[in-house]
Design a protein with these regions (language model features):
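Predominantly the C-terminal beta-signal and adjacent terminal strand-loop region
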Residues: 27, 169, 183-237
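Cleavable N-terminal export/targeting peptides
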Residues: 1-34, 237
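Flexible, solvent-exposed loop segments that connect beta-strands
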Residues: 54-71, 103-124, 157-167, 203-222
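Structural signature of outer-membrane beta-barrel domains
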Residues: 47-51, 101-105, 152-158, 196-202
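Residues on the lipid-exposed face of transmembrane beta-strands in outer-membrane beta-barrel proteins
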Residues: 42-46, 78-86, 98-100, 129-137, ...
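Residues that define the transmembrane beta-barrel architecture of outer-membrane proteins
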Residues: 36-38, 74-78, 123-129, 143, ...
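Repeated loop/turn-to-beta-strand initiation elements of outer-membrane beta-barrel proteins
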Residues: 50, 91-94, 141, 186-189
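Short glycine/proline- and aromatic-enriched beta-strand/turn motifs that initiate or cap beta-hairpins
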Residues: 23-76, 235-237
Length: 237
């Protein structure tokens, strides 16, 4: 939650800066680009993955071990993809922006019984297909702020077996965000900050590949896990 407040403060400062700049009109770059019904482009960005883990206090009856797990650090990664944008009205557009998210989630484990520690770097390569509704303000000079929200399906291609924890390969998210269109002389640049909230439990509870009880205890110690992500994206149209 602290990180989300920091990201929102950053975007608020950015919006106030734009308002300060909007004191007089200037010559518009690419004045007719928004009249086209279809827009295409690509996007690159950075993201911070998170995994909210719910511990259940399970105690191993054989050893007395009680492991607690948490996503104990920020996990920055890289994103890249393409986009297609369909203008519905002058202020509303439907956008599809399939892409790849390369990242990881660092999980720390602590045994409450003896203080022992373990860790896991849960690597992910998501193939993502987000569908968003983009609602934009009227254009002023060479920028145009907007809000965006929608739904995304992601498939993790690096879901390796044998790890202490595994998450489901297919995950779904709802997302909301904000951004701004900047009209440059030769293209349109859209920096955007978006928050992804995972739907449902993504922890893989049935681990038939684990035959050692010492490996199974990490999954048994968790009730559920929820994915999340904060993505800073730069769209080029």
């Amino acid at each position: 939650m602290h990180n989300i407040r920091r990201y929102i403060l950053l975007m608020t400062t950015f919006a106030l800066t734009l308002a300060t700049m909007a004191q007089e009109r200037v010559v518009q770059n690419k004045p007719f680009i928004d009249e086209r019904p279809w827009h295409y482009g690509f996007h690159i960005g950075l993201h911070d993955q998170s995994l909210k883990l719910i511990n259940n206090g399970f105690v191993d009856p054989a050893t007395g071990a009680q492991w607690m797990a948490e996503n104990d650090r920020q996990n920055f990664g890289f994103s890249v993809g393409i986009l297609g944008d369909w203008r519905i009205t002058r202020q509303v557009a439907l956008r599809v922006s399939p892409g790849l998210h390369f990242g990881s989630k660092h999980i720390g484990f602590r045994n409450q019984a003896d203080g022992a520690r373990r860790s896991q770097d849960l690597k992910t390569t998501y193939v993502a297909v987000p569908v968003d509704l983009k609602i934009a303000a009227p254009r002023f000079n060479n920028y145009r702020p907007y809000l965006v929200g929608g739904f995304s399906a992601m498939y993790d291609m690096t879901n390796a077996k044998g790890e202490m924890l595994r998450t489901k390969a297919l995950q779904t998210f709802v997302q909301i965000g904000m951004g701004c269109d900047f009209y440059l002389p030769f293209f349109k640049l859209n920096p955007e900050l978006k928050f992804y909230f995972g739907l449902g439990d993504v922890l893989l509870h049935q681990r038939a590949e684990l035959t050692n009880p010492e490996q199974q205890i990490f999954t048994q110690s968790l009730s559920k896990a929820n994915s999340g992500m904060v993505v800073l994206t730069f769209y080029f149209e």
